[in-house]
Amino acid sequence: MRIGHGFDVHAFGGEGPIIIGGVRIPYEKGLLAHSDGDVALHALTDALLGAAALGDIGKLFPDTDPAFKGADSRELLREAWRRIQAKGYILGNVDVTIIAQAPKMLPHIPQMRVFIAEDLGCHMDDVNVKATTTEKLGFTGRGEGITCEAVALLMKAAK
């Protein structure tokens, strides 16, 4: 078994909506990013790549490459997952923690889980997404942006 950890953060800027976990969430502010700014899928992609020792999302999809300007993070996740499967790994489970003072994530979590399960070709039981705040402390608590952490467990497929 192999475990990977991912982290991502984006500052608020511009106009909403925002995209988190593949879900378009109405909000007055947007997130500043080269791609669509989906902190949940970026952290998850990093966790998966880390578990497979394939580097990170910035190595695979550099923000210096104009091809990834405004990229759909679901497509990036699916491409990373294809590469991980090509190395002979299968998914154990993933766990994603979104850290944001606002907007509220709870109403959107079921759809996030559906999208992640679809993108990874796994059961919903293998995908957990949760959200919390920092009780108004720090960068996220002041409403300056959104942070996300994720862990992923991979196993070698039976031959």
Curated annotation (Swiss-Prot):
Where is coiled-coil annotated?
none
Which residues are listed under the site Transition state stabilizer? H34, T133
The cofactor remark states: Binds 1 divalent metal cation per subunit.
Q: In which pathway does it act?
A: Isoprenoid biosynthesis; isopentenyl diphosphate biosynthesis via DXP pathway; isopentenyl diphosphate from 1-deoxy-D-xylulose 5-phosphate: step 4/6
Biological processes per GO annotation? isopentenyl diphosphate biosynthetic process, methylerythritol 4-phosphate pathway; terpenoid biosynthetic process
- EC number(s) on file: 4.6.1.12
The organism's superkingdom is given as Bacteria
Q: Which cofactor does it need?
A: a divalent metal cation
Positions contributing to 4-CDP-2-C-methyl-D-erythritol 2-phosphate binding = 8-10, 34-35, 56-58, 61-65, 100-106, 132-135, 139, 142
Q: Give the matching PANTHER family.
A: 2-C-METHYL-D-ERYTHRITOL 2,4-CYCLODIPHOSPHATE SYNTHASE, CHLOROPLASTIC
The UniProt function text for this chain reads: Involved in the biosynthesis of isopentenyl diphosphate (IPP) and dimethylallyl diphosphate (DMAPP), two major building blocks of isoprenoid compounds. Catalyzes the conversion of 4-diphosphocytidyl-2-C-methyl-D-erythritol 2-phosphate (CDP-ME2P) to 2-C-methyl-D-erythritol 2,4-cyclodiphosphate (ME-CPP) with a corresponding release of cytidine 5-monophosphate (CMP).
**Subunit note:** Homotrimer.
Q: What is this protein called?
A: 2-C-methyl-D-erythritol 2,4-cyclodiphosphate synthase
Organism expressing this protein natively: Salmonella arizonae (strain ATCC BAA-731 / CDC346-86 / RSK2980)
The upper taxonomy is:
Bacteria, Pseudomonadati, Pseudomonadota, Gammaproteobacteria, Enterobacterales
- Gene designation: ispF
